[in-house]
Amino acid sequence: MITREFDTIAAISTPLGEGAIGIVRLSGTDSFAIAQKIFKGKDLNKVASHTLNYGHIIDPLTGKVMDEVMVGAMKSPKTFTREDIIEINTHGGIAVTNEILQLAIREGARLAEPGEFTKRAFLNGRVDLTQAEAVMDIIRAKTDKAMNIAVKQLDGSLSDLINNIRQEILNTLAQVEVNIDYPEYDDVEEATTAVVREKTMEFEQLLTKLLRTARRGKILREGISTAIIGRPNVGKSSLLNNLLREDKAIVTDIAGTTRDVIEEYVNINGVPLKLIDTAGIRETDDIVEQIGVERSKKALKEADLVLLVLNASEPLTAQDRQLLEISQDTNRIILLNKTDLPETIETSKLPEDVIRISVLKNQNIDKIEERINNLFFENAGLVEQDATYLSNARHISLIEKAVESLQAVNQGLELGMPVDLLQVDLTRTWEILGEITGDAAPDELITQLFSQFCLGK
């Protein structure tokens, strides 16, 4: 296991650049001693914990005043890392925060690795692995709903569910041990078999129910992957720009001007819509455009939602019919663009629920948002306030494996296998669930997860 004997680390916890405040954070047993060497003000070793203290940062070698600061002094164990923490609040700016950080390092601190503060919180038992991952999700959340899921996970909703199941599995394993220790008692074996069957079915149902939230959780966390498709020059890029309320894609009358896949985010009902403006799908001899077309086809296959744009002022072409065919099994909304011009498209060959729009005149764009809302939110019941959602790919994969192990136990019971032979699968389920919370996670995984954090967190 990773050692719990830590040195004192330091890092800048605010974004680099100009700002009102910059924060240099220290964590470890020597935090107060290091800060006291460079801080002129109250004796930090004597101040009350969790207080802000006015003073100046001074280079002890030269006597140079670096900045006027407020120093937050927080004593263990009631801190984020459960170690002594010092937070030096400086005036924002690259130079001053860097110089103060270098002073702290010179006086005995070590530059923190990415995510090392949160890693220490995990290793010191302040948070488990799901809660540590929730910290990153809060930082990366693009909407309030994504943030709410992350906050709920940070609060321990997923941890509590997993830990309760693990405890129940341990209780069940204890009963199996009784069967192994006292095989001469047939009534004990029958009781144990009945308990194991009942409990494993209960565990499987709970985890399967949790897995059903994965699609909704992924949407709330990552957004609805939305491919805007159509033959060249039907208004795909104009639609993207309209939804974004800014010009991101090149808009011209020349077919093939979008040569690659453009991705941008827009909020619909508090959920991120990841808009993908694809290159027009058509046959072309242009090598660069061909690459864009292939990427467009890939985006179409992977999209949660497809916006198919057709030109209402022109008859359906072979390319239009091809797009209608290849997208018919997707979650699709058909948009008839350029309705400000005389309509010549054959609507009898289209589904009835098309939306007529004019991107140029900004007509009926709101109806697209209404349709998306109906597809994903109102009809699907996307958000339940008190529900626990799976949104992390690592969690989903592990719970799928846990369900498979439980199914193996249930199948063995159906075949009449003795419960003691099924102990291995039940124990494996307990171990897999422990990987989710970090109780049984390998050191390499922990290191890899925390390396994804930013410096200072």
From Swiss-Prot:
Record keywords, A-Z: Cytoplasm, GTP-binding, Hydrolase, Magnesium, Metal-binding, Nucleotide-binding, Potassium, tRNA processing
Binding site for GTP: 233-238, 252-258, 277-280
Highest taxon of the lineage: Bacteria
UniProt EC number: 3.6.-.-
One GO cellular component term noted in the UniProt record for this chain: cytosol
Cytoplasm keyword on record: yes
GO biological process, one term: tRNA wobble uridine modification
Recorded GO MF terms: GTP binding; GTPase activity; metal ion binding
Family, as annotated: Belongs to the TRAFAC class TrmE-Era-EngA-EngB-Septin-like GTPase superfamily. TrmE GTPase family.
Protein name per Swiss-Prot or TrEMBL: tRNA modification GTPase MnmE
Species per Swiss-Prot/TrEMBL record: Streptococcus pneumoniae (strain Hungary19A-6)
Lineage of producing organism: Bacteria, Bacillati, Bacillota, Bacilli, Lactobacillales
Chain's gene name: mnmE
